[in-house]
A protein has these predicted regions:
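Short, low-complexity, intrinsically disordered N-terminal modules
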Residues: 3, 21-24
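Calcium-binding acidic motifs and repeat modules
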Residues: 26-263
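Bacterial N-terminal signal peptides that target proteins for export
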Residues: 2-13
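Bacterial N-terminal signal peptides
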Residues: 12-22
Length: 263
């Protein structure tokens, strides 16, 4: 049996097919891998010095303490103890501080398992920026292995935090230390044969990079630097104009591993 197609049937079908092919060519979904960078932030942020994750310090016994499964390998009974909260879902990480010894030290429970025996210690130094106060700081950033739940699977990434000051022995005040996220995320978006560097910055110091107040940056002038004018808060970054007449949607559901861009 022979079928005959009329022009009225063929031409509209061809037009629809061409339109579909054109739209598919113009629309693409791209997975952008992210990598942690632990140098200074991508641009100088105007963040107040006292802003960060504030962790209260309390003197505590290190033996027989449910929060300390194994204490550091030093001969002391009492140390300062603090807790920081990072990751998604939030997880508690302990810190122990000794400012009574010849060397002032802080131990970080990097993986949150309450075992300080094998953990790295960082030396603290007294700051002269606050006369009359016992203020210490760490010149080395503190490392935490922060965990995230992505699509039902656990993902762990090292995140570094600066310790700009630790204040103790203030009459009538709580002792505390302050942590500021040093690590940021970098990646490269490919759009119309061009490579656009991108970055994500943790602005609330919880080791996450996809909170509404965190920042998403694109180096749109290709000067290999990020500026504050190239930053937008995550809550405003679901839909962006990448280039003139080119718009896209960004899915931050897999941060810090990757973002998914549809354009």
């Amino acid at each position: 049996m022979t079928y005959r197609l009329h022009r009225k049937t063929v031409f509209p079908g061809l037009i629809i097919l061409l339109l579909c092919l054109t739209l598919n060519a113009q629309t693409g979904k791209q997975e952008v891998p992210l990598r942690p960078v632990s140098t200074d932030r991508p641009f100088r942020l105007k963040v107040k010095e006292e802003v960060g994750q504030r962790c209260d310090l309390q003197m505590t016994r290190v033996r027989g303490n449910s929060k300390i499964e194994k204490p550091p390998l030093i001969d002391v009974n009492v140390l300062y103890y603090a807790e920081a909260v990072f990751g998604n879902p939030a997880k508690t990480y302990g810190l122990l501080v000794d400012i009574e010894g010849e060397r002032k030290l802080i131990w970080v429970d990097a993986d949150g398992d309450r075992d300080f025996a094998e953990e790295t210690s960082y030396e603290l130094f007294k700051s002269d920026r606050y006369p009359g106060l016992n203020v210490y700081y760490s010149p080395m950033p503190l490392r935490f292995d922060v965990t995230y739940l992505i699509a039902g699977e656990e993902y762990t990434m090292p995140v570094y935090f600066d310790l700009p000051y630790l204040i103790v022995a203030r009459a009538g005040y709580h002792d505390f230390l302050l942590l500021k996220t040093r690590t940021w995320l970098a990646g490269n978006l490919y759009l119309e044969d061009e490579e656009i560097p991108i970055a994500l910055v943790d602005m609330d110091f919880n080791g996450c990079f996809d909170d509404p107040q965190d920042l998403f940056l694109m180096d749109m002038d290709y000067d290999l630097n990020f500026s504050s004018s190239e930053a937008v808060k995550i809550r405003n970054a679901a839909k962006l104009r990448f280039k003139r007449r080119t718009y896209g949607e960004i899915d931050f559901g897999s941060v810090p591993k990757k973002i998914i861009v549809t354009h």
